[in-house]
Swiss-Prot record:
Keywords: ATP-binding, Cell inner membrane, Cell membrane, Lipid transport, Membrane, Nucleotide-binding, Translocase, Transmembrane, Transmembrane helix, Transport. Residues 37-320 form the ABC transmembrane type-1 domain. Its EC number is 7.5.2.6. Its main location: membrane. It comes from Burkholderia lata (strain ATCC 17760 / DSM 23089 / LMG 22485 / NCIMB 9086 / R18194 / 383). This is ATP-dependent lipid A-core flippase. Disulfide bonds: none annotated. It is found in: Cell inner membrane. Pfam families: ABC_membrane, ABC_tran. Homodimer. GO terms for molecular function: ABC-type oligopeptide transporter activity; ATP binding; ATP hydrolysis activity; ATPase-coupled lipid transmembrane transporter activity.
Length: 593
């Protein structure tokens, strides 16, 4: 299935143009404008030296050869060539260094802004975008802007100045012949405009396919166990091959479109050169030009072709850069999640109320949650039960404001959550997700995630989570690296490490989505004991899957189709004989089996 890239958006109402991209980049360039001007000046020196080479040929050929040649011309011309090469080399090095300094500074700032904006976007962003799209934007696509800032700018500035200097010298040598050379320029401009539009469309589609190819790799790596157990290697290989072939097709179409410009440009230049030679021969017969003047003119004309070719070739990377800019600034312009009303919350009592809360994702036929109302007293444990798709996860996601309700209000300590500063609100909550998330860092850093690790507190949290002995047996103890998402730990150890992280935070409100994965009896016992310690004295909302957790809850809310259909203690709901009793009976039979 193809993914739709919603990050890439035109940067103005009519599309993306180089001027639009430059306007967006200007705030990043402005603090470095002095260095940019210096780089442009050094590129101007490089361009001027290009015209100096044919300028030295004319006196050498006219006055340096033969028995009547000038002695001074025989010596000053070679020395001037050496001096010219030295000036050119120093200027070229300086311009490259200065431009790379500027572009890398801007690259760093763009990348930091993109990552910061990603961190502060709402949960809907992460549901909408694939990880591969975001990774490509932050890590890879931003380098296209680097290419534009260096290679493209060098071409546009240095080669444009080179063409101007050479055309000026050509006009000085022979204005009639120069007018013939100038005839090819409109033809080249017409070619560029025709190829430009097609290249931009192909680049946009090529980058979309690249993201989809990355997504296939991401899915295959993340689900390698399923792939292997279900013998899905052939299916994944076919999927990857088909997408790679489509990507190759677009790459070749880009090559065909981009490659037409150079030979057509050279053909037009060859026609102009043939006409110039013909006219120059006629002029020489009438003593209107010299050998040195003719050679200098032809040399200058040939030297013009190379920078012109570079200016034509710059179109392809320029289009790639503009397409990348749409993705980069699409992420930077992504709206940040609301930060709340700014009200502080130093220490919550743990008093929670859902008041006629309705929520829908926009595309569903019915609300995901429909007029949900309940209260949770400080220290009370509420278990959420119900069939899959009943709205349990959505309900707990509203409390830390991953999403805001469509209607109704959620209150903490009698105050709507929207009135609190968002960071202050979330600082009062700990979450243990069903899908355990660990970071490729040490055990201590994972336990104290978001804070500077206090090793004594980390050790206490590990002991409370029944993980201290296992960590002590590891070679590096608290400094043991857990690997990507804790791959070096067992399933039970990963769950207990996530519990230790919640214990370390010591927040008064706990959101717990119990893992459904089965563990061996010993690991299950350790995890259950750790959960009981974690929930002590905390207001707890738990999506319960274990019978033992459900049974010890102070109150159970049973959801179905986004509504609370039953409420009460375990014994009360069993006696009622409704949906909860039915679900309990099924789960009990499964566990007994």
């Amino acid at each position: 299935m193809e993914t739709q890239n919603t990050l890439r958006k035109p940067m103005d109402g009519t599309g993306t143009s180089p001027v639009t991209v430059l306007k967006r980049l200007w705030p990043y360039i402005r603090p470095l404008i002095g260095i940019v001007v210096l780089a442009v000046m050094t590129m101007g020196v490089v361009a001027a030296t290009e015209a100096g080479i044919p300028a030295l040929l004319k006196p050498l050929l006219d006055h340096g050869f033969g028995s009547h040649g000038s002695d001074s011309a025989k010596w000053y011309v070679p020395m001037a060539v050496i001096g010219l090469a030295l000036v050119r080399g120093v200027s070229q090095y300086a311009s490259n260094y200065l431009l790379n300094y500027v572009s890398n500074r801007i690259l760093l700032q763009l990348r930091l802004e993109m990552f910061q904006r990603m961190l502060h976007t709402g949960a809907s962003f992460f549901q909408r975008e694939t990880a591969s799209t975001v990774i490509n934007a932050i890590v890879f696509e931003v380098n296209q802007i680097l290419s534009v800032l260096t290679g493209v700018m060098v071409t546009l500035v240095r080669d444009s100045l080179t063409v101007i200097f050479l055309l000026g010298y050509l006009f000085y040598l022979n204005w009639r012949l120069t007018l013939i050379v100038a005839v090819i320029l409109p033809g080249i401009g017409w070619l560029v405009s025709k190829i430009n539009r097609r290249l931009r469309r192909l680049n946009r589609e090529h980058q979309t396919l690249t993201n989809e190819l990355s997504y296939i790799v991401e899915e295959t790596v993340g689900g390698y166990k399923v792939v292997k157990v279900h013998n899905g290697e052939a299916y994944e290989m076919d999927r990857f091959t088909q997408m790679s072939k489509r990507l190759r097709g677009y790459a070749m179409r880009m090559t065909i479109s981009g490659g037409l410009a150079q030979p057509l440009t050279q053909f037009l230049a060859s026609i102009a050169l043939a006409v110039v030679i013909t006219i120059a021969v006629v002029q020489s017969s009438n003593d209107q030009t010299t050998v040195g003047g003719f050679v200098a003119f032809v040399t200058s004309m040939l030297l013009v072709i190379s920078p012109l070719k570079h200016l034509i070739d710059v179109n392809q990377p320029l289009q790639r850069g503009m397409t990348a800019a749409e993705l980069i600034f699409g992420l930077i312009d992504e709206p940040a999640e609301p930060q709340g009303g700014g009200r502080p919350l130093a220490q919550s009592r743990g008093d929670i109320e859902f008041r006629n809360v309705t929520f829908d994702y926009g595309a569903a036929e019915r609300p995901t949650l429909d007029r949900i109302s309940f209260k949770v007293a400080p220290g009370e444990m509420i278990a959420l039960a119900g069939p899959s798709g009943s709205g349990k996860t959505t309900l707990v996601n509203l409390l830390p404001r991953f999403f805001d309700p469509t209607d109704g209000a959620i209150l903490v300590d009698g105050v709507p959550v929207a009135d609190y500063d968002l960071h202050a609100l979330r600082s009062q909550m700990a979450m243990v997700s069903q899908d355990v998330v660990l970071f490729n860092d040490t055990i201590a850093a994972n336990v104290a995630y978001g804070q500077t690790p206090d090793r004594a507190r980390v050790q206490a949290a590990l002991e409370a989570a029944n993980l201290a002995d296992a960590v002590a047996a590891m070679p590096d103890g608290l400094d043991t690296l857990v690997g990507g998402n804790g791959m070096r730990l067992s399933g039970g150890q990963r769950q207990r490490l996530a519990i230790a992280r919640a214990i370390y935070k010591d927040a008064p409100i706990l959101i717990l989505d119990e893992a459904t994965s089965a563990l061996d009896s010993e690991s299950e016992r350790h995890v259950q004991a750790a959960l009981e310690r974690l929930m002590e004295g905390r207001t707890t909302l738990v999506i319960a899957h274990r019978l033992s957790t459900i049974e010890r809850a102070d109150r159970i809310l049973v959801l179905e189709a986004g509504k609370i259909v039953e409420e009460g203690s375990h014994d009360e709901l069993l006696r009622h004989g409704g949906l909860y009793a039915h679900l309990h009976r099924i789960q009990y039979q499964q566990q007994a089996a």
